[in-house]
């Protein structure tokens, strides 16, 4: 199913999300079954390939659902992620996955640009989103000039940036992944974390993550 920008924006609105739930009600499940099912569902990407750092077979896997337009996600990227990466990801103890959950069409376009710039290079992708999060205010104005400037810094021509942000196939996949996360994983806001399949909603400090990871590594 092809999703236009306008349709994508409508789905992201509160009314659109309510309609989505109304059209596709979730089954009632017990807590234990729900947790087990969610842990299985969240383990693999749906449409877009995962962007991840750290060994796949690490003892702890953290999956973050984030929106490029949300300040709490930017704060995590700037204040928490560097310490998490240094202590646990780069040392092979944590496998960290970043998944997009755009809260508005601007975030969706910026996510598409990040993937376009990075290609299949996960390391480059994380460098790109770090840069984009630090320029969040300017990017959310979503002017042609601001996107072109980011693209230029990444080595893309203005035409390439325009092609990236109008990539219908990537937008369809982004929309499908967001819908799956909302309907099946109960992701409703960002950031949302899944730590070895256990959901943690809302911002987490490094101290909270450190304590949780430490407890899992001891098991």
Please identify what each model-predicted range represents.
Residues 1-16:
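N-terminal secretory signal peptides and thylakoid transit peptides that target proteins
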Residues 3-7, 35-36, 67, 149-219:
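C-terminal cap of thioredoxin/glutaredoxin-like
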Residues 13-27:
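Bacterial N-terminal signal peptides
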Residues 27-34:
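Sec/Tat signal peptide C-region and signal peptidase I cleavage site
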Residues 43-60:
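A short beta-strand-turn-helix
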Residues 56, 89-91, 185-188:
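Extracellular/periplasmic catalytic domains that process cell-envelope and extracellular macromolecules
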Residues 66-69, 74-152:
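Structural alpha/beta surface segment adjacent to cysteine/selenocysteine redox centers
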């Amino acid at each position: 199913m092809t999703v236009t920008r306008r349709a994508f924006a409508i789905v992201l609105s509160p009314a659109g999300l309510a309609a989505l739930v109304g059209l596709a009600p979730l089954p009632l499940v017990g807590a234990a079954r729900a947790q087990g099912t969610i842990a299985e569902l969240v383990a693999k990407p749906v449409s877009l390939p995962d962007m991840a750092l750290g060994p796949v077979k690490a003892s702890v896997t953290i999956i973050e659902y984030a929106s490029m337009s949300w300040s709490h996600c930017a704060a995590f990227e700037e204040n928490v992620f560097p310490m998490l990466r240094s202590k646990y990801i780069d040392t092979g103890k944590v496998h960290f996955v970043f998944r997009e959950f755009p809260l508005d069409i601007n975030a969706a376009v910026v996510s598409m640009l990040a993937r376009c710039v990075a290609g299949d290079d996960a390391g480059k992708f994380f460098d790109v989103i770090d840069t984009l999060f630090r320029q969040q205010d300017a990017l959310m104005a979503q002017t042609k000039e601001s996107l072109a400037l980011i693209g230029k810094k990444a080595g893309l021509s203005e035409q390439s940036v325009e092609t990236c942000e109008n990539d219908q196939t990537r937008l369809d996949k982004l929309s499908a992944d967001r819908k799956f996360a909302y309907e099946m994983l109960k992701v409703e806001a960002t950031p949302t974390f899944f730590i070895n399949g256990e959901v943690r909603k809302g911002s987490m400090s490094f101290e909270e993550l450190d304590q949780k990871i430490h407890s899992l590594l001891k098991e």
